[in-house]
């Protein structure tokens, strides 16, 4: 067998690059090369000489003796993280942050209040090489520390990814004006005391021409625009030319005000979760969808009911849900969403209705009025194919068979096929569906009933919430 030692340096480097690409996690990506440099002097020279193309990093954790060991290595960029687990001992993290001219990635999650203040104290000056920043305050903290305006020296020119969760940062819009290379922006679990108005958000986004993903999520439904101060629709829109994905969690009025001010011609994915509300009125959202080509046509929809939420998903690209527990509230809320064109249904042909089979299972009662189901189904006027799980077949078929005489096609007028996950022979569902088929046949509308085998793996991958 030929020895690897006969390989020239350029081929050896390609082997090392291949090894680098096989390491998927942050930990493995930052530590894989350290074993190579201890093999022999030649390997060490090849690795160190090619540090830029191999993207060599030094990882600093709460357990890394930074002050004792960091200078042993060449001055590679630093990755500062507590991925192995949150801790109150942040001395080594703080020591790593002192090397601000070398830090290019910070990933700190579930940081408690006192530790967070120590981190903030070391981040008031510019971090000129910083490209990735993830800060998550512990969800157990009742008093949220305020990030001062001087954070990062008010400048982040190389930052590409910014994730802030549970963070109170009034000066964020000013910082974003300097982050012109930002690709992903995640602002999640925003405290009510840290409310940012839609107008301020859009102003901050206006300079982010490279932004591809925006996640904006509020902690409470109290975070909503003041009705008295809501502005009329803007005659011009801020164009976000690179934006492809939006995640939003909040109230309907906020989303409506936000999209009234923007255009996103490349938007392919839109995922929305509303807090429970009585009315969903979003005229500007409808206009936004009409000028977003990739989201106008919806061919199939999955209506899914779960423990704490109900969701409508369209082709994995467009998802809107409502946070509430009781099934009757979920059905009623989805009907209101559909009536407000969340999502647009004029081109819909395939409708799936089922329960979520993973996660905590709900304890639903069989006391939902049939009229609630009929009101929801009434919104799907173009559906040709209806897919029903065992859990919901009995409920929905019972509601449909109440439509007799001239009302048989009042709901789902273009229906051609019903697909059932499972039906007990001779059971009530089979009898009721026979009546529905017969009644439709008399009115000149033929319906075929078939078996549906659910694709559980696809269901798991389908939803983002």
Regions found by a protein language model. Give the residues of each.
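Leucine-rich repeat
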Residues: 1-465
């Amino acid at each position: 067998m030929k020895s690897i030692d006969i390989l020239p340096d350029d081929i050896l480097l390609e082997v090392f690059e291949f090894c680098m690409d096989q390491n998927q996690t942050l930990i493995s990506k930052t530590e894989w090369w350290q074993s190579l440099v201890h093999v022999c002097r030649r390997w060490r020279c090849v690795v160190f000489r090619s540090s830029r193309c191999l993207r060599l990093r030094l990882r600093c954790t709460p357990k890394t003796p930074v002050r004792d060991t960091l200078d042993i290595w060449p001055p590679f960029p630093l990755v500062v993280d507590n991925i192995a687990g949150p801790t109150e001992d942040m001395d080594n993290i703080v020591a790593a942050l002192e090397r601000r001219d070398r830090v290019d990635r910070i990933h700190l999650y579930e940081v408690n209040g006192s530790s967070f203040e120590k981190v903030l104290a070391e981040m008031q000056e510019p971090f000129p090489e910083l490209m990735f920043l993830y800060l998550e305050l512990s969800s157990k903290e009742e008093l949220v520390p305020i990030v001062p305006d001087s954070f990062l020296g008010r400048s982040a020119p190389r930052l590409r990814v910014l994730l802030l969760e549970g963070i109170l940062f009034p000066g964020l819009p000013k910082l974003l004006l300097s982050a012109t290379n930002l690709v992903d922006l995640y602002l999640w679990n925003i405290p009510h005391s840290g409310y940012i108005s839609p107008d301020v958000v859009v102003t901050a986004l206006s300079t982010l021409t490279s932004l591809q993903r925006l996640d904006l999520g509020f902690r409470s439904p109290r975070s909503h625009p003041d009705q008295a101060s809501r502005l009329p629709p803007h005659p011009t829109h801020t164009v976000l030319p690179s934006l492809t994905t939006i995640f939003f969690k909040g109230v309907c009025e906020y989303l409506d005000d936000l999209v009234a001010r923007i255009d996103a011609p490349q938007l392919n994915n839109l995922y929305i979760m509303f807090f429970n509300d009585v009315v969903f009125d979003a005229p500007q959202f409808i206009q936004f969808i009409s000028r977003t080509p990739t989201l106008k046509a919806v061919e199939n929809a999955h209506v899914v009911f779960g423990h704490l939420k109900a969701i409508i998903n369209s082709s994995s690209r467009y998802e809107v849900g409502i946070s509430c527990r009781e099934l009757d509230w979920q059905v009623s809320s989805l009907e209101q969403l559909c009536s407000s064109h969340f999502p647009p249904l004029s081109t819909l042909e395939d409708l799936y209705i089922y329960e979520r089979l993973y996660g905590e299972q709900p304890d639903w009662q069989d006391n939902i009025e049939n009229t609630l189901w009929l009101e929801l189904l009434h919104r799907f006027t173009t559906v040709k194919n209806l897919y029903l799980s065992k859990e919901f077949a009995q409920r929905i078929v019972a509601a449909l068979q109440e439509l007799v005489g001239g009302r048989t096609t009042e709901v789902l007028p273009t229906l051609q096929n019903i697909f059932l996950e499972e039906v007990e022979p001779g059971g009530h569902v089979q009898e009721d569906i026979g009546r529905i088929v017969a009644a439709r046949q008399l009115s000149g509308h033929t319906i075929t009933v078939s078996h549906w085998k659910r694709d559980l793996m696809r269901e798991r991958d389908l939803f983002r919430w």
